[in-house]
Regions:
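N-terminal helix-turn-helix
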Residues: 1-2
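Periplasmic-binding protein-like
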Residues: 21, 71-80, 142-146, 183-191, ...
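Amphipathic helical "hinge" segments at domain boundaries
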Residues: 7-66, 70-71
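Flexible loop/hinge segments that line or gate small-molecule binding clefts
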Residues: 78-122, 219-229
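Hydrophobic alpha-helical segments within soluble ligand-binding/sensing domains
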Residues: 82-83, 105-142, 195, 235-254
Length: 269
């Protein structure tokens, strides 16, 4: 220091920077779309620490431990394979002014916080209504819904309601191990790895996709435009989901907002 001079340090230098803790349950093509849209909308002035907890509550809890106070916002995609009640209780105890949930609305979490979500039951009903003219060329609709998964059971409720309303034969499969592929059937798949297996088995059975067998895949990704001249998809607008979550963070918004569902009809149906 220089004798006779007094230095003043602005309080602004000690203000906590705006930091976000971002927790995804897993990595996938559509999660990348959410991430890219979210971070692009936030811009370079916001710091984001990104973690993946692999649908595992123990890992989720470990990541959160001692970190809450360091962040301005905690943004979570809340899907778990196990210990759902413990996970929801932990989330419910987070400061609500910091909490932003993405992709899923959870009734067990109360208070004034922010959610950007999919309305699973209404979305599947809306999508199948949009595709009803194409579906009328088939008599049976089967959904591949893995028995051990984080997918919302409300998807099943909406699917079954639609099939019953329009008198389609329907079935819920946990996997494709013992499946007999017959003409007149439409398959709805949720998991990306099941889509590869499904297409391979249909082709091996020498059935034509788009006429004898229909395929509908959850979650639009760029590659689905190209597979078999185009796979029909039903999907949340993931870019909008990421952008909306970022806007809610930047504006310190509260409330629950459902993201529109989109149907992209292609040659597989």
């Amino acid at each position: 220091s220089v004798p006779g001079k007094v230095y003043f340090v602005s309080n602004a230098e000690f203000e906590q920077p705006f930091k976000i803790l971002l927790l995804f349950n897993k990595l996938s093509d559509h999660k990348k779309i959410i991430y890219d849209a979210f971070t692009a909308k936030l811009g370079n002035d916001v710091s984001v620490d990104f973690y993946v907890y692999n649908n595992n509550f123990s890992l989720f809890r470990k990541i959160l431990e001692d970190k809450v106070d360091r962040y301005s916002k905690i943004v979570i995609i809340p899907h778990f394979f196990n210990e759902h009640e413990s996970a929801y209780a932990l989330i419910n105890n987070l400061p609500k002014e910091k909490l932003v949930l993405v992709d899923k609305l959870i009734p067990e979490i109360s208070g004034n916080f922010c959610t950007v979500y999919e309305d699973f039951e209404k979305d599947i009903q809306y999508a199948l209504e949009e595709l009803r003219e194409r579906l009328s060329n088939y008599h049976t609709i089967k959904m591949i819904f893995p028995s051990k998964s984080y997918y919302s059971k409300k998807i099943l409720s909406g699917f079954i309601d639609f099939c019953q309303q329009y008198a389609f034969n329907y079935e819920v499969l946990s996997d494709l191990k013992n499946e007999r592929f017959l003409p007149g059937t439409v398959y709805i798949n949720l998991r990306e790895d099941h889509l590869v297996e499904l297409v391979e088995k249909i082709v091996n059975n020498k059935l034509k996709i788009g006429s004898e067998i229909g395929v509908i895949s959850y979650n639009e990704t760029p590659i689905k435009k190209l597979i078999l001249s185009g796979i029909t998809t039903i999907s949340t607008n993931f870019a909008m989901m990421g952008e909306t979550a970022a806007n809610m963070v930047l504006n310190n918004s509260k409330g629950h907002l459902a993201i529109p569902f989109k149907v992209t009809a292609r040659n597989s149906l």
